[in-house]
Amino acid sequence: MRHRKSGRHLSRTSSHRKAMFQNMAVSLFEHELIKTTLPKAKELRRVAEPLITLAKEDSVANRRLAFDRTRSKEIVGKLFNDLGKRYATRQGGYLRILKCGFRAGDNAPMAYVELVDRPIGGSVEAAE
């Protein structure tokens, strides 16, 4: 029985899932808008939001934790210099998930994941 088991397997091994969500989080923080399937978007929220909460308090220990979870110096810099300051007063809910129809090949439900209060310069086509 799967009672009280949280998280989705997404037909992947645990190492594949970890690597996939690490890469998706880096892409999300880099572009601030990505397009993915709805179940992946809902799971990505569980990975990305704690990183922004971590970035709200700038310390060497927090930077090392963020680097351990993203493996990207550029993204750690953006998290602590830009996103941590942008969401300093927000208590959570840093991501918005917008349903955007179904994928043509297999009819999978798709969604946009974007950072709340992001600058309105980015285009939706860049996310695809």
From Swiss-Prot:
GO terms for molecular function: structural constituent of ribosome. Part of the 50S ribosomal subunit. Contacts protein L32. Belongs to the bacterial ribosomal protein bL17 family. Disulfide bonds: none annotated. One of its GO terms (biological process) is translation. This is Large ribosomal subunit protein bL17. It comes from the Bacteria. GO terms for cellular component: cytosolic large ribosomal subunit. SUPFAM superfamilies: Prokaryotic ribosomal protein L17.
